[in-house]
Amino acid sequence: MTYIVIGIDGGGSKTHAMVADEQGRTIAETVGPGSAVRPGRAEHSANVIAEVVRDALASCEMTHVTPRVLSIGVAGAGRETERNELWQALVSRDLAAELVIHSDFSIALDDAFADGPGVLLISGTGSVAFGRGPTGATSRCGGWGPVCGDEGSGAWIGRRALSVVTAAADGREPETALTGAILTAAQINETSDLIGWAANAAPAQLASLAPVVLSVADAGDLRANAIVSLAVEELVLHVRALARHLFGDERAALPIALSGGMLSRGTTLRKRLEHRLKSAVPGGQLRTDVVVPARGAVRAALRILGEVMA
């Protein structure tokens, strides 16, 4: 009998599922809406994940098959309370024989470095850094959520842009091309309308403004460039903190991997970050291959499958 497993990467803006056989060969992939778990919102995340699992099985005509292991890495699940709430919301749905929930950063670290040392920096809707030192010890930095932290993330950049636009409307900041660009992206006509828009905006909606900020920065706008520069510095601080904590020195030789939509290859944020890391973390060895967190979730599922079948 051939067994299948499913690996899930659930972020704030999208959820990526990979179906694989017991040898780890990819059978199908699908993408759905964001499923990041927020306090008190586990049912919503579970609904999205369940739908993505069904879509993934349908895409490879395996709706009649029960996956042996469903391995889920989801933003917000680094906190035990939210992780337990999500597990409770999912376990009754009988999506798989075995269900395991990880943080999004742990599955990404697995894909980036397997069992080896390194620091992974993620910037998507939110941001977090996670690392493993030479001794095997692990630690995280950031990931405090959209209200308290997530510095250098898409949502954080979007919030900073709103502050700049409203300050420019007051005359506290110089005029900026961000004003027109942000109003257009938010599909509103007046700066005053931003109050209502922002009050109802989810982190993913704030993050949708980040590409606009990067585009305006590329066109030479000083305020947009200042936001991007500050985002870079905030992200660098995450890496430096873990370098000190796990490797003893921010100048130590350490592998670094970048992940998340804001740090996709070719983005302005990634290019500036790569340049800054050369001086800020001189011992850093930047990985150029693409990190696929869902693939890390599949790898975790295969380990569990091996234990179950042993």
Where are these regions (language model features)?
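Conserved phosphate-binding catalytic cores of ATP/NTP-utilizing and phosphoryl-transfer enzymes
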Residues: 1, 97-120, 137
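ATP-binding/phosphotransfer module of carbohydrate and carboxylate kinases, centering on a glycine-rich
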Residues: 1-65, 111-117, 162-310
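Glycine/charged-rich beta-loop-alpha catalytic/anionic-binding loops adjacent to active sites
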Residues: 30, 68-70, 90-94, 136-145, ...
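Short beta-strand-loop/turn "lid" adjacent to the catalytic site in phosphate-handling enzymes
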Residues: 38, 56-95, 100, 110-113, ...
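Glycine-rich beta-strand-to-loop/alpha-helix junction loops that act as flexible
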Residues: 71-77, 123-125, 254-265
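Short, active-site-adjacent cap segments at secondary-structure transitions
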Residues: 78-80, 107-109, 128-129, 264-265
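Active-site nucleophile and cofactor-binding loops and adjacent substrate-binding regions
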Residues: 99-107, 122-123, 151, 285-295
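Glycine-rich phosphate-binding loop of actin/hexokinase-like ATP-binding domains
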Residues: 116-172
